Structure formats: structure tokens, C-alpha cells
Amino acid sequence: MATDGASCEPDFSRAPEDAAGAPAEAAKKEFDVDTLSKSELRMLLSVMEGELEARDLVIEALRARRKEVFIQERYGRFNLNDPFLALQRDYEAGASDKEKKPVCTNPLSILEAVMAHCRKMQERMSTQLAAAESRQKKLEMEKLQLQALEQEHKKLAARLEEERGKNKHVVLMLVKECKQLSGKVLEEAQKLEEVMAKLEEEKKKTSALEEELATEKRRSTEMEAQMEKQLSEFDTEREQLRAKLHREEAHTADLKEEIDKMKKMIEQLKRGTDSKPGLSLPRKTKDRRSISISVATEGPMTRSVACQTDLVMESAEPVKKLPLTVPVKPAAGSPPVAAGAKGNACASAAAVRPGVERQVSHGDLIGASLPAAPPPSANRIEENGPSTGSTADLTSSPTPVPSTVSPASGHTPAPPPHSLHSPCANAPLHPGLNPRIQAARFRFQGSNANDPDQNGNTTQSPPSRDVSPTSRDNLVAKQLARNTVTQALSRFTSPPAGAPPRPGAPPTGDVGTYPPVGRTSLKTPGGARVDRGNPPPIPPKKPGLSQTPSPPHPQLKVIMDSSRASSTGIKADNKTVASPPSTLPQGNRVMNEENLSKSSSPQLPPKPSIDLTVAPAGCAVSALATSQVGAWPAETPGLNQSACSERSLVIPTTTASSSSIHPVNASSRRAGASDSLLVTASGWSPSLTPLLMSGGPAPLAGRPTLLQQAAAQGNVTLLSMLLNEEGLDINYSCEDGHSALYSAAKNGHTDCVRLLLNAEAQVNAADKNGFTPLCAAAAQGHFKCVELLIAYDANINHAADGGQTPLYLACKNGNKECIKLLLEAGTDRSVKTRDGWTPIHAAVDTGNVDSLKLLMYHRAPAHGNKLREEPGLAIFDLDQEEERHEGTSKPVVPADLINHADSEGWTAAHIAASKGFKNCLEVLCRHGGLEPERRDKCNRTAHDVATDDCKHLLENLNALKIPLRISVGEIEPGNYGADDFECENTICALNIRKQTSWDDFSKAVSQALTNHFQAISSDGWWSLEDMTFNSTTDSSIGLSASSVRSITLGTVPWSAGQSFAQSPWDFVRTNKAEQVTVLLSGPQEGCLSSVTYASMIPLQMLQNYLRLVEQYHNVIFHGPEGSLQDYITHQLALCLKHRQMTAGFPCEIVRAEVDADFSKEQLVDLFISSACLIPVKQSPANKKIIVILENLEKSSLSELLGDFLGPLENHSTESPCTFQKGNGTSECYYFHENCFLMGTIAKACLQGSDLLVQQHFRWVQLRWDGEPMQGLLRRFLRRKVVNKFRGQVPSPCDPVCKTVDWALAVWRQLNSCLARLGTPEALLGPKYFLSCPVIPGHAQATVKWMSKLWNAVIAPRVQEAILSRASVKRQPGLGQTTKNPSQGQQAVVRAALSILLNKAVLHGCPLQRAELDQHTADFKGGSFPLSIVSSYSSCNKKKESGAWRKVSTSPRKKSGRFSSPTWNKPDLSEEGIKSNTILQLNCNRNASLSNQKSLENDLSLTLNLDQRLSLGSDDEADLVKELQSMCSSKSESDISKIADSRDDLRRFDSSGNNPVFSATVNNPRMPVSQKEVSPLSSHQTTECSNSKSKTELGVSRVKSFLPVPRSKVTQCSQNTKRSSSSSNTRQIEINNNSRDLEPTQK
């Protein structure tokens, strides 16, 4: 049983192993608890526990059983009754151990052994169980950690997805922005087309004029011939006339004789001739009369007409200009002349002066009027307004001030508050110019007799001068003020009696009744303070307030208002903002001075009550007497009362008798005058007076607080009383910075605001948060307070600490009236808050559509009194007005403001869409410049955050952006040079809106095509605006909208001008057209437009090539390799084939590639098999044959085509040629006229015997420096860039543009250098550069591509060309130098490669120096030490650029066949510099300064070896000369642009008489550091020809030495030592030295 129990565990562990098969026994031994799962461990534990329990039971049973067996075995056979058995027991017990039986034979021993084993197993199991539990705990902890890691992984994955989404949105956003910009491109393209249309018209006109000119020339020629003929006739006639003249002279002589006779007879008959004079006199009179008539009708009449015209014009002009020019406020300092006198003077002057002279400048008027001294009477008349008699003159007189100049703004901070409507009331505010104040003082002191009648009487009839509108309105103001004050005071005072006078204050007359425009006060020389003036009157529609009739009022009102509108700089709803911003500090200074004077004046206890009727002449009534409850703002005096009639005003419900008090004004109070705390026109009760002011000067302790409370509560009476306290700070601010004016404006107490403003409270005083009273009033919607504050020059654009302007606060709270007032005042709609919100954000945030419409559509009125003349339009018809605006006018806000994003990137459209304000979103979307795809900082568009309704709206409003692509059809694969051509190019994205019509769509497509063709053919990276003016017809490639064969919208064909039933919007959405594809006409249609677009060869040139083929039948295209000869010939053949097939002729193209093994017999077989050559006896067929022979440069033209020259020139039987067939028979053949032959030669120029063939063919030379090849690469790469940017032209500073420009420059510089070296066989066409990669942001890819191109194509060609030229003139024994070049030739090749690499390739690379260093090693030959070139001067021409810097600029001695004028003009003045800059990277910079001493000897060594090694070949010498020249003065002028450190530069001059060639080399291994040998600038270099240098200087080539930074010498010299020590030749030594010059170009 125990055995079975012990075997439970192995059985359990064996169960899974048995299933595994063979390794069950091994698995049982390798049973590992760690591999079990938790459930399996639990099961194992339960099994173990059960086994242990069973084992315990078995043990107990076995123990009992053992005891029984022991007893039975030991004592069972014995019995106490049997002594023998007892003896036997004793014997057995006493026996020795050895004699006992083995224990193992006893079952109990076996059981004990089993139990001991079980105990050991139990202990082992418990140990394993404990280990398993610990591992289980560890596993649980690891699982928890794994779960945490998984959660973190999920979070990171989510963030990764979010970042990917953001990046995707950013990409989409950029793409959409590109599309939007393409829309702008379309608009500008339309302008371009218009300009082009005008240009075409001008061309047509020019051609017509040229034709007319030619016609005129012919006519002139004919007329000259006629003239010659007539002259000959005239000569004949002249001779005849001369003869006749002689006869007449003879006759005249006879007549003279007869006359003499007659005179004598007359004298005799004189006395009897009375009747004869009577006959002659009438004749004379008749003549004289005719003369007089002509004079009278012509001369005088003309003169009178002119005078009448001038007079009419001059007299009409003042009347015409009058509404704009009659001044309300004359210029500062103008003499206060009477209006009548002024008007008469001006009118009389207008009749005399020309109209031009009338436009005098403002300064002239001011200067001319300053010296005049005002007479008192004139001053008086001006103050009280023009009289009746002067009114007519005033209305007809021109203004002395230009209508566009504010009279006060040029010289004064602001007009005084009482000077709005007095024609001469504007006094200069400069301290020295105060005639206005002096006149006022004279008026106050000298007219006391009339003042009681005007100011103190109780009669209601106004004085006679009140016919003047100004004074009449002022009287109304006085009466209204008196009524309102009486109403205010009647609540707590005794009945009105009289006003208490102030001692010493002169009477004011009417000066104070003029409403103030600004708050700037005046300080008189005597210290007196001009009073703040009277508040304006209440509109006359209120009951009992209108006191005077106004019959002549309306006419003058129009004139005055219009003149005021035209004579002020800033208009705000008919309120003259008389003080420009620059005058605010001046105004504050004056006000502060006035406050100081107020605080220093003594305060006397006022009398409690004074009757106004008995007041002395010198008294003045306080502002309380003139305060008006609910009066209209100061800018609306009697001239505009009607405009205020419908405004709701705060007016007391009770009115007192208007006849009780006449308004007077407290003005010009002297410094010694006592100011009462409460002075009233009606008097005060004795019980109230002591409470307020009895017992001496009024205490000021709690006054500011009391002033705040009165203003906040709207207590007009108390506020007026406090304001008359002398020394009270009305601008006092409480703890939160609120002034009394701020409190009044915030609570909407218009009357209190007016009183405070009249008291000159600071209108722009801000609280601790930067809010002004205007901000508070606008935020609370108190539009009357806003209007009043604006009238007093409040800063409408003031921004609080958070950037909130009054307009922003008004929009934030939806106060339409305030918004309109502020907009009409000219506030800035684009001011932004601290978090980037504009008023448009605020209006949209509240969902207030009316506010948003006002912001977008409301314009400031053209005339300032528009609002007042049409009061009904003010507020109540706002919706209708704005709807009218939307329908008839465009939004006044720019697109930038509509699309402005706040600090979170949210535009107004985001806010409206996210809050579901669909109406606001619709208003925004009506703006044409809205960009609904603008994304916030979380990469969300307005559509992304919009509600469902707003999403639907945006989806319907957004324009569909469909890419427009140009396709040239499928390009046939093959070796036609078209491997890099693209079949399709995206040129732009078309914006299709709901309202887009098919006509608009056609125009957009046509315009986009025109713009694209113009863009890719322009010379630079011009924007479309620039191209409009910079493009010329020469730069065009000849493509236009007429080059289109077909257009497909998605998959549906469409033609320009075609219309479908659906609109373009619906059509594109219904058919799911993802793009518009334009297919250009190609060879299949007999056109070459697609070929032009694919290859960027101008259409005119391709058509010319085709014409040559059709006309001459034999055309050969030749040019450098890679000039697209094969592609051109194939496309021309295709076009010609389809043209012939269209004409009804069958046509076939036969291509043959010529190689070195191509024989003449093969060519004959080709011609015969293709039916080009036909037997003479056979008639030609109608079939057209086009034969293309490619790669003719691989064979000899004279050998291959020599026998065909005659027959090819004459395609007829007249020029037969006999060819022998393979069977030995010969037959005559001829080329029929339906045969065309085209050939291609990849060679820049013909040589040798091939020149004999030249005259028999028509040749098309594809030069690299002429069209079409010259601009082909630029156009091709430009189109590539445009395609990469999806139709947009990047800016010239874009890295992609710089990279493309660099690739283009590499091609040009390479060819320029190669042409200059006389190696035309190495010239490259643009084909190799067409594959230049255009990858925005990855210029390294282009550099890598360039290195591959250099290593695979350019370097091998250059090497082959240099070697071939260097060995051209060598002796036959040296003919193998090309295969086994000499050391000198190798040096020349390597030098040439290095120079080309650095001057033509690496020069101008857009990469930074550090990046370029990494790629330099990829170029073959880039690390060549250029000092070797210096030694092998005849061989190393090109690689020496950095090392040698030869100065010789004499013409290179070239072989004649290589010389070309264009090749001799290197464009390398800048490239050479760059080459040395690059090569210095390859130079070790370890040279020590001690090497400078041996510099001159090293130079001699270099030049000596230069000469010795140049003896091998003249061409090598030429090469070396060119290499030296390329490295010398051509680029030295730009060294300053390259050198990094100019502080350590050293110059070493070489003497011209140095015996360089005779120098011997004593130490070949001496390191020559030509870093120290620095070429001089071009003006310091020695320039001479070879002959000159040899004879005069003894030097054929003089080195130029550039300055070298000393810090870079050390490494190069050490490198030189290492290199030179490894060779026994001088060449290698100098090679390394030559390499040292490279850093000089840095």
C-alpha cells in the first residue's frame, strides 16, 4: 500500500510525458515543478496532501499490526505454563547478534525502512512545496509587473497612434494649404492671361502698324518717283516761265512808260477829277468796314467768351466747395475777424484769383493770419456768432482752411471745450499764442452793460443777435440747463430765486455755452482758468425745452455739418475728435496745471442764496446752475438737435418753468475767486446750507469717496455740488482703481458722465486691470455713455491688461449699439487679447450674429452726420441694414482677421462650429477668405470639432479640391532617351465650389494650364505675380490651352466649354472624380505638344526640325552624348508617320543601331529591304519609309555613307547607284522621294574625313550652350519640382530650389570647364541629369546621386578625354600612353578630375560643410593632392585647382579643331574658389610654421618640375595652362568670400625675375608647403603671354599665391613629408605640396 501511495507522484508527472512518446523516462527524471501552471500546482498539492494523509493512516495501521505481529511472533508460541518455552525465550534473548536472523527477513524492518523513506520523501516534498510557493509568489509579482507594463505599452501605443494621426493631419494640412495657394495661383494666372491678351492685342496692333509702315514706305517710294518726274516737269516749265518772264518784263517796261505818260495826264487833269474820288471813297470804306467787322466778331467775341467762362468757373467753385470747406473751427491763431468781413474778403478774392491759387496750404493760412490783431468789436461779433447780414457772406465764402486738414490738429493739442461752433473760437493752445483768451477777457470786462440783458434777464425773448444759429442754439442750451437744474433742485430747495455770484468772476456772455469738443483746458497768462463750458442742450422734442424758433436753421446746419465733416481728421458718428493721439500728453499736462492752480486757490465760504437778477456784473454762476439732467452729448449742439429727437434720455419727470432761470456759465474764474460748494441758480434753503458748507472752507476729507458714490448712484445734484468744490481731485481712484468717471460710465449714468467730462475728468483713466470708463460702458452696453466718451476723445483702441478693447468687451456682451458706435468712431477691429482673441472671436463666442455682422460688414459712414440725419437707422433697423450690407457690399474685414487663430490655434470658425452656432458659421463662411481647413494646435479643423449641423454646413460650403494633371500619353519603352520622362504631372488643385459654373470651370482649367506652362518655362523661381511682368515670349515653350487633346473628369471625357446638366460641384461628387486629367496632343495626332511637354524642348524648335525632315528628307542630329538625339528623332518619326497616314499614305519606321562592325553592305541591305533603295526599272510605291540610323559616331561617316551621298541628295532616277549583290550581280538603285533618312551622332563636332559628308546633309546641332539644350534641363527640373510640390512654385530660398539650381550649375560648369580644356568629346548632354532626385528636405540624396553619376559617367569620360588629348601629339613609340599612361599623364588626369570636382561639382553644393565632408569621399578623385599637378604642369591641368593657382591668363595655345569662341569663355570665376574650399578637407593640417622658410625654394622646385615635365607634349602644356588658368585669377576675386579666418593670413610674393626654370633641386624630398603659397588677388597677379614671360621675365607661367591661414599649415607639411619620403621622384613630393594649397580657398 505504501508503495502504491509513493508512486502517485511519479504517475502524475509521467502522465504528460507518456503522451510525448519515447523520452518518457528522461522526462520523469527531469520533472520540474517550475514548468507547472498554477492549477497544476494546486492539483499536485492536493494529491500530495491526500497521499500524506493516506500514508499516515497506513503507518498507524502498520504500527498496530507490527505490535501484534511482534507479540505474536515473540510470545505467541510460548506459554507461561510451559517452562521449556520460557527457557527457549531466554535462550533466544541471550543469544549473540550474529546468531540472530537478519532483520530484513522481518516484515517490520521492511516497514520501518519504508516509513523512513516515506519520511524523507515527505520532507523533500515539503521543501519543494515551499520552494514552489515562493516561486509562485514571485510569479505573481512578475505577472503584476507584466500587467503594468502591458498597460503602459497600451498607453504608449495609443499615444503613438495619436502622434501618427497628428502627423498625418499636419501633412494633410500642408497639402491643403498648398491647394489653397494654388487657388491664388489661379487668380493670378487670370491676371496673367489678361495681360497676355493685351500683349497679343498690342502685338497685333504692332504688326498692323508695321504693315502700314511698309505700305507707307512703298507709297513714299512711289511718291518720290512721281516727285522726280514732277521735278523734271517743273524744270521744263520753269524754263518756259523764264522765257515768259522775259516777255512780261519787256511788256512791263512798256507799261511803265505808259504809266509815266498817264501820270502826266493825271496831273494835267487833276483839277477836273472831283467825281473820281467820290467813286474811290466808297470802295475804301467798304474795305475798312469789312476789317472792323472781322475784328469785332473774332477778337472781342473770343475774349468775352473766355472771360465769361473764367468768371463762371471761379464764381461757381466756392459754391460747389462750400459744403466741404466752410470752417467750423478756423485755424489756430487766425485773426478773429467778423464773419461778414471775412466772407466778403474771401468772396472778392475768389473773383480775382485763379481757381488753382485758391488751394492754399494750411500752414500758409496760419502764418498769414498770425500777425493780425483782433479788434474788440470783431471779437465780440465772432463770439456771439455771425450776424444776419454776415450769414449770406459766410455761406458763399470759401474756407480759409483746406477741407482735408483739421484746423486744430496741426498746432494745438485739442480745441477748448467751449469753442466748437464759434467761427473764431479755436484759440491756439500754445502758451504764447492766446489771442482767443485775451479777446475773451476783453469781452468779459468790456461788455458788462449787455450781459445782464443776455444772462440775467427773466425775459424769454432772445437778443437780436440770436438770429445767428449758433447763438440761438446756445440760448436753447441755457434755457434747457436752467430748466433741468430747477427740476433737480426743486426736490429739496426753496423755490428758485437767483444765483449767488462769485466775487471777482467776470460775466461769461455766450462763451461758455458752446459745447466742448475736447477736455483740454486753457491756462491764461494771468493764472485764470477758462471754464469747462456748458453741456449741450437736450433735444427739442422733449416738452417745454425748445424756447426759440429756428426758421433759417436747416440750411446752415447742412453747410456747417458738412464743413465740419470735411475739416476734421477723425470723425466718429458726427462727433469731431479734435485731438489727435499725439496731443494727449499735452492735454494731460495742461489739465494737471489747472488742477494745481485749483488746489492753490483760496476757498471762501459761499453765500447761501443770491438772486440772479441783482447779481453784480462780475459774478459767475457755478456749473450746478448749468447742469442738464439727461442732456445730449457735447458734440450735438443746436445744429444737430433734430438728430437726437428720438433718443431715449434720462430726464426728470417734472419740469419747472423754463422762464425762471436763464443759463449762464461759470467761465474764466480768476485765481482769487471763491468757489462755493453749492451754488445754484434757484437758491438753497438755509437749513440745508449749513449742513453742507457753513463755517469756512469746505472740508475735503471724505469728498473723493462721496464723489465716487454720487457718480456710482447717479446723484446728479450732489455730483454737481462736489464738482464745484475747489481743490477736489475728480480723478481720484479708489483701491480697485475705479475713478468717479469709471463708476458713472459703468452704471450708465449719462448725466454724471457728462458732468465729470465737463469738469475735465481724465477720460482714459484706467483701473488696476487697465479698464477705462469707455471699456466699462461698452461692456455694460451703455451706448449713450459710450457715445459721450467717444465725443470727449476717449481712446477707442485702449487695451486693458488682458488686451481687451472696448470693441472686444462690447462684442463679448453682445452690445450692438456700442459696437456700432465704436465702429463708426474708427476703432481697430484687429486688436488681439493676451490669449489671441479678436473681437470676432468674442462675438462668435457669444453666438451673437448681429454683432458678428456688424464687425464684418459695417463701414464707418462717409459723412459724419449720416447717423444724425437718419436717426431711424441708428439701432432699430440694424438687421435690415446689415442684410442690405451683406447683399450689396463685401465684408470690410480682411481674410487674415477672419482666419486669425488664438493661442490654442482656434479660429472664429472653430468656436462657432464647436458651440453649434450655425448662424455665426454661415456669416463667417460668406467671407471669401475663410479657410475652413485651418487646423488648431491639436491638428483639428473646424469640421473636426463641429456639431452635426455645423459639420453639414461646412461640408456643403467647403470647396472641392480636385488635382489637375497633365498627361502626355504612354511613353514607349526603349532606348529613346525617355527613361526619365514622366507620363503625368500634377500641376495644381482646382477649387470647385457649389456656385462654380461650367464656364468658370473651363476658365479655371485653361488658366491653370497657361500658368503652369508659363511657370515651368520661366527663367527663375518666380511667383506668379513676378512672372506676369518678368516673362517674355522667348522663354515660353510654345504650349497653351490650345495644345490640349482631351480632358477627362475622373473617367468621364469632357472638353473645354462643354456643360453638363449637373453643376461641376454635383458632377464631381456624383461621379466621384478624384482628378482632372488633361491629355496633350501628341505624335498620334500629328502634333508635338506632348513631346514638348515631356522633353521640355520648345514646340517651335521641334516643328522646325520636323519641317527640315519633310523638306530635305536627310537630317542628322548631332550633339554631345546625352543630348536626346534618339528621342527627338523617334518622336519626329512618329509624328511624321501619323501625318502621312492621315494624308492616306502607308508609312513605316525602320530603326538601325550603328556600331563599329556595321558595314556598308549591311546598310545597303537595310535600304533595299526597307524599300528605300529600289531598282531603277521599278516605279516607286506610295509607301513612305522613315529610316533612323542611330549612333553614327561609332562608324566612319565617309566610309559608311560615302557611296550614298549623291543619290541621297537627289531622290530620283537621275542619281542612281550601282551595288553588287552577294551572288556577284550588280544592279542600279535609287532613293525614291518617299524616303526620309534621319541620323544621330553623339559627338559635339565632326573631325577629319567626316567633314566631307557634312555638305550633303541638313545638320541639326544640339549645342549644350544653346537652345534647346541650354534651357532644357532647367525647365525639366523645374517641372519636376512643381510636380513634387503639387503645382506650387516654391520660393527661391527653399532648399529644393537650391539643390536643383546646384545640379543645373554642375552640368553647365562641367561643360564649360571641359570646353575650355579643349576636350569636346567629354561634353555631356542634359540627359544624364534628368534623373536628378527632387526630395524636399533631403539634399543628401541629390549629392549621393551626383556622386554615383560622377563615378559612373563623368569621371570615366573625363579621364578618357584627357588621356586622348594628352597623347595626341606624342611620337608613335609613345602611342600606347592611353592604355598605359605615363606618370605625368596620370597626374594630369587626376588633377583634372580634382579640379573639375571642386570647381564644377562641389562648388555651390547646398549642403553644410560638415555634411559635405561626409560625401566628398564618395567622389572619385576627390582626395587627390593637387600639388602633384604643379609638378606635372603639362599633365595635371584640371586637378591642380586647389594646389597650383596659376595666374597666367594668356590665351591657351589650342589645336585649331578644338578651339571654339564660346568654349573659351569660362563661367568659372566663382567655381574655382569653391574647389579649393572643398579640397582643403582632404588635406592633413599638420604642417609647422618652420616650413615657411623653405617656401621660395619649394616654389622654384615646383615650377622647375613644372617646366621639365611639360616638355613631353604641347597638348599637355596646353592642358596644364588651362588647368592653371582655371585655378588662378578667374576666381581669386572671390577669395574673401571663402576664407574663414582672415586674421592669420599670410601673403608671399614671388618675384617676377625669379630664375624659376633654372632652379635646381637639391633636396627632392624637402616638403613644400604650398599652403603658404597663396595666390594673390587678381589685380596683384602677373599677367603675361608665354613669349613675353620667357623673354622678359624668364617665366612661362607665374604662380599666384593666395593667403593661407597659418593654423592650417602644419598638417599639410607633415603630410607632405610622409608622401614624399615614400617616393624617389620629385613629382610625388610636389604633388603632396600642391595638395597643401587647398585650404587657402576656405
UniProtKB/Swiss-Prot annotation:
Predominant subcellular localization, coarse grouping: cytoplasm
Keywords: ANK repeat, Cell projection, Coiled coil, Cytoplasm, Methylation, Phosphoprotein, Repeat, Synapse
Subunit structure of this chain's protein: Interacts with CTTN/cortactin SH3 domain. Interacts with STRN, STRN4/zinedin and MOB4/phocein; this interactions mediate the association with the STRIPAK core complex and may regulate dendritic spine distribution of the STRIPAK complex in hippocampal neurons. Activation of glutamate receptors weakens the interaction with STRN and STRN4.
CC terms in the record's Gene Ontology section: actin cytoskeleton; cell cortex; dendritic spine; FAR/SIN/STRIPAK complex
Domain of life: Eukaryota
Chain coiled-coil ranges: 119-276
Record flagged with keyword Phosphoprotein: yes
UniProt modified residues of type Asymmetric dimethylarginine: R491
Biased composition (Polar residues): 385-394, 576-586, 1552-1563, 1571-1588
Gene3D superfamilies assigned to the protein according to its UniProt record, in alphabetical order: Ankyrin repeat-containing domain (1.25.40.20)
Low complexity bias (residue ranges): 395-407, 1613-1627
Function: Regulates the dendritic spine distribution of CTTN/cortactin in hippocampal neurons, and thus controls dendritic spinogenesis and dendritic spine maintenance. Associates with the striatin-interacting phosphatase and kinase (STRIPAK) core complex to regulate dendritic spine distribution of the STRIPAK complex in hippocampal neurons.
Modified residues (Phosphoserine): S1513
Segments of skewed composition (Pro residues): 497-506
Region of interest (Disordered), residue spans: 1-27, 203-222, 366-433, 446-471, 491-611, 1441-1469, 1545-1642
Organism of this sequence: Muntiacus muntjak
SUPFAM superfamilies on file: Ankyrin repeat
Any one GO molecular function term: protein phosphatase 2A binding
Protein name stated in the entry: Cortactin-binding protein 2
Pfam families membership: AAA_lid_NAV1, Ank, Ank_2, CortBP2
Annotated localization: Cytoplasm, Cell cortex; Cell projection, Dendritic spine
Chain positions of ANK repeats: 702-732, 736-765, 769-798, 802-831, 835-864, 904-934
